[in-house]
Amino acid sequence: MAYYTVGTIVNTHGIKGEVRVVATTDFPESRFAVGSTLYAFQKDQATPVTLTVASVRQHKNFYLLSFEGKPSINDVEIFKQSTLKVTDNELESNDLRPGEYYYHQIVGLDAVTVDGENLGKIKEILSPGANDVWVVARPGKSDLLLPKIDQVIKRVDLDQGKVIVELMEGLD
């Protein structure tokens, strides 16, 4: 079963079993909805703990979650610094508009220029601000950083396992 990260528990909040979560998903409303199942991966633990969201509210830049069967701070303190994940069963394709993709769909694809030159494989996606940056691992060269803008990313072909790109001046 594949798991995908949706947030990190950074601390507890109050004494009634709430935790502060930094979301790393574009869909926090559905991922953290009451009744949702999340999997907490703790450091040095191979097996995740299954948690069901009992309540959710937003507070500053965090989501405050409580979980069924965990009514006090003592029940949730062990989850500090845990990574919250969902399974591929919880990913809904209707979350995405045409032309949008999950990170795991992009990472591993070949980056190919419009002229057919293979640049390398996309190894990670950075989110520094206005737009994502796709990092391409190039054999024998330093990594290539491709901004996720229409002028650079021309087409994503999941069936062929490649992304067609047009290198703008200064990118290479």
Swiss-Prot record:
Subcellular location: Cytoplasm
Coiled-coil features, chain-numbered ranges: none
InterPro entries hit by this protein: PRC-brl_dom, PRC_barrel-like_sf, RimM, RimM_N, RimM_N_sf, Transl_B-barrel_sf
GO cellular-component term (any): cytoplasm
GO biological process: ribosomal small subunit biogenesis; rRNA processing
Entry keyword set: Chaperone, Cytoplasm, Ribosome biogenesis, rRNA processing
Gene3D superfamilies referenced in this protein's UniProt entry, alphabetically: PRC-barrel domain, RimM
GO molecular function: ribosome binding
Domain annotation PRC barrel: ranges: 98-171
Superkingdom, natural source: Bacteria
Pfam families reported in the protein's UniProt record: PRC, RimM
UniProt-listed SUPFAM superfamilies: PRC-barrel domain (SSF50346), Translation proteins (SSF50447)
Keyword Cytoplasm (UniProt): yes
Major localization listed first in the record, in broad terms: cytoplasm
Free-text comment on this protein's domains from its UniProt entry: The PRC barrel domain binds ribosomal protein uS19.
Known partners and oligomeric status: Binds ribosomal protein uS19.
Sequence similarity: Belongs to the RimM family.
Functional note: An accessory protein needed during the final step in the assembly of 30S ribosomal subunit, possibly for assembly of the head region. Essential for efficient processing of 16S rRNA. May be needed both before and after RbfA during the maturation of 16S rRNA. It has affinity for free ribosomal 30S subunits but not for 70S ribosomes.
Protein name: Ribosome maturation factor RimM
Organism: Levilactobacillus brevis (strain ATCC 367 / BCRC 12310 / CIP 105137 / JCM 1170 / LMG 11437 / NCIMB 947 / NCTC 947) (Lactobacillus brevis)
Originating gene: rimM
